[in-house]
């Protein structure tokens, strides 16, 4: 049975993923969802293979698919367009596993095509001798036609494919073992990829076909928990448009349980078309607002790049379309929201003048200045955590936030922060994802960056994925600096929430790029309170230098003087 992936079998080094890819194509006629699962597995195995043979790819903290795909060095190597193709495969695989919506041949075929392009890239960069191949869907369509005409040996083939599927469903790739097996190839293949990659011509994302574009957008909606035909409607006819027919067709409208519109989605072919879609979507939103006395949120998307217009902040990019509960929460908060101009800070939590000033600066930034990022630079010991707890208290009472995410890079900082929140804001439900496994529904979530990266793609409930892009209304980043952002920027790009960064690094020593991350002028944080001022105010004491001599520096180390343990 010929497939598009047979060429991979010519090189033994591709064996860890070649057979799974072949199986994904062979089973597409009989079971499209099994084909999608195999496409996802083949992609995961191929990614792990790349990590095992390329010296520029460092193992992330976890070797699951989400972590491997989102590592910054990996994304830089494969490029944006190819990563987006791969993300479609990942998303469809998740939808098969977690969604009630059936995936069909169209989705499976697009997964196969995207997988083919990814594996062709691997062959181009790492093959001994590269031969150009094109994905040929006619091979599959001919097989479909043969199946329709003759069923003589179809039962035997089906039995063979079922056994094959069962075999690959149990197969796993041990990344550490793969690294050890491919150690001898690493230098040679890393060099080959560096030589080959510059001449690789990426296959452009073809979103001109409405059908193809819709598959990408539908997968995004399904992953967010929307149900087609129930709370997600396609091609909704709206009367009252300023055209000859006075009728317009909204590509998608998303509804709540009372069938009130939550969002309107305008799907366009390219990013260039977004401006056209923007005006059209605004007209649709105007009509729906007149009918339901509530203006829906607007999303503009081509399946890869998505923009949101919520009427509160300027139009911005967002990672995905919101889930139903994200949008329902957003409207509930909108109905409770009050101005941040005249706030009252709980002095039992943060009673010092500079803490109150910091909170008011952030509120002014979020409110009057209409910004979504703030950076607080406060000396160690001046009460950054108390300040941010009091800020959360203000924003909760003003109806600006419901769900809060507190991120830190060490378990100890996460534990300390949660303890302080519980003591000072006892009415706020809190959970530490590092320790409290299973308690995911608290309104204030504390986590390391690594743990949250893993939870985004793995935690779900009866309504679908839990940590969707609109789940949190405020993200707090402890010890915010450029290196943290670079390493985990996918978290900040994924969650569409206002961001508050905390750091004790003196404002004139903070990397210029950190200010750029928070969209601030270099050297000008949202609020700063330095050590010198804290000492002057009597809240902190200055450091004292103590001179001392070190034996190692003064006299060096003699091997004969070392203990037996140190000698080893």
Q: Residue ranges of each PLM-predicted region?
A:
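Amphipathic alpha-helical interface elements
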Residues: 1-165
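Conserved G/P- and acidic residue-centered "switch" motifs that form tight phosphate/ATP-binding loops
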Residues: 104, 381, 478, 503
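ATP-dependent helicase/translocase motor core
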Residues: 120-403, 408, 412-428, 440-444, ...
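A short beta-strand-to-loop transition that corresponds to the Sensor-1 phosphate-sensing loop
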Residues: 302-303, 447-451, 479, 502-506
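Residues immediately C-terminal
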Residues: 413, 451, 479-483, 490, ...
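Short acidic low-complexity segments
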Residues: 430-438
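SF2 helicase catalytic motif II
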Residues: 463-501
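Interdomain helical connector at the RecA1-RecA2 junction of SF1/SF2 helicase-like NTPases
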Residues: 512-568
């Amino acid at each position: 049975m010929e497939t598009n992936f047979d060429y991979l079998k010519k090189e033994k080094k591709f064996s860890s993923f070649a057979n799974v890819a072949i199986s994904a194509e062979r089973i597409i006629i009989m079971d499209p969802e099994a084909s999608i699962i195999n496409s996802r597995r083949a992609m995961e195995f191929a990614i792990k293979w790349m990590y095992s043979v390329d010296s520029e790819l460092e193992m992330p903290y976890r070797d699951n698919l989400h972590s491997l795909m989102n590592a910054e060095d990996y994304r830089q190597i494969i490029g944006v367009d190819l990563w987006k193709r791969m993300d479609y495969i990942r998303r469809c695989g998740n939808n098969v596993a977690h969604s009630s919506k059936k995936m069909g041949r169209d989705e499976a075929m697009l997964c196969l095509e995207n997988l083919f392009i990814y594996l062709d890239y691997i062959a181009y960069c790492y093959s001994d001798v590269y031969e150009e191949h094109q994905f040929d869907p006619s091979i599959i369509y001919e097989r479909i036609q043969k199946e329709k005409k003759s069923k003589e040996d179809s039962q035997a083939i089906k039995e063979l494919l079922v056994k094959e599927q069962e075999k690959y469903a149990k197969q796993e790739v041990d990344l550490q073992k793969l690294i050890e097996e491919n150690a001898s190839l690493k230098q040679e293949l890393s060099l080959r990829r560096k030589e080959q990659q510059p001449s690789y011509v990426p296959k452009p994302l073809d979103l001109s076909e409405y059908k193809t574009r819709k598959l990408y957008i539908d997968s995004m909606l399904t992953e967010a928990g929307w149900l087609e035909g129930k709370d997600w409607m396609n091609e909704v006819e709206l009367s009252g448009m300023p055209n000859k027919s006075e009728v317009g067709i909204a590509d998608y409208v998303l509804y709540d349980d009372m069938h009130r519109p939550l969002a309107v989605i305008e799907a366009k072919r390219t990013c260039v078309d977004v401006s056209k879609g923007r005006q059209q979507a605004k007209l649709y939103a105007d009509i729906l607002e007149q009918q339901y006395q509530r203006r829906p949120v607007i999303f503009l998307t081509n399946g890869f790049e998505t923009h949101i217009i919520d009427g509160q902040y300027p139009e911005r990019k967002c990672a995905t379309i919101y889930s139903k509960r994200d949008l329902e929460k957003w409207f509930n908060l909108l109905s409770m929201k009050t101005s941040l101009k005249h706030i009252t800070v709980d002095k039992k939590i943060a009673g010092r003048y500079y803490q109150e000033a910091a909170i008011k600066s952030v509120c002014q930034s979020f409110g009057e200045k209409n910004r979504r990022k703030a950076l607080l630079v406060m000396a160690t010991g001046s009460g950054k955590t108390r300040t941010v707890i009091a800020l959360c208290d203000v924003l909760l009472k003003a109806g600006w936030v419901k769900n809060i995410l507190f991120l830190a890079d060490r378990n100890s900082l996460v534990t300390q922060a949660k303890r302080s929140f519980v003591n000072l804001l006892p009415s706020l439900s809190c959970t530490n994802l590092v320790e409290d496994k299973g308690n995911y529904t608290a309104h204030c979530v504390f986590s390391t960056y690594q743990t949250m990266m893993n939870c985004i793609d793995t935690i779900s409930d009866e309504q679908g994925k839990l940590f969707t892009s609109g789940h949190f209304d405020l993200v707090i980043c402890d010890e915010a600096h450029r290196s943290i952002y670079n390493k985990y920027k996918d978290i900040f790009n994924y969650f569409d929430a206002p961001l508050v960064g905390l750091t004790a690094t003196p404002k004139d020593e903070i990397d210029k790029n950190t200010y750029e991350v928070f969209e601030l002028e270099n050297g000008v944080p949202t609020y700063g309170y330095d050590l010198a001022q804290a000492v002057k105010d009597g809240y902190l004491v200055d450091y004292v230098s103590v001179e001392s001599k070190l034996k190692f520096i003064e006299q060096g180390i003699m091997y004969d003087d070392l203990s037996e343990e140190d000698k080893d």
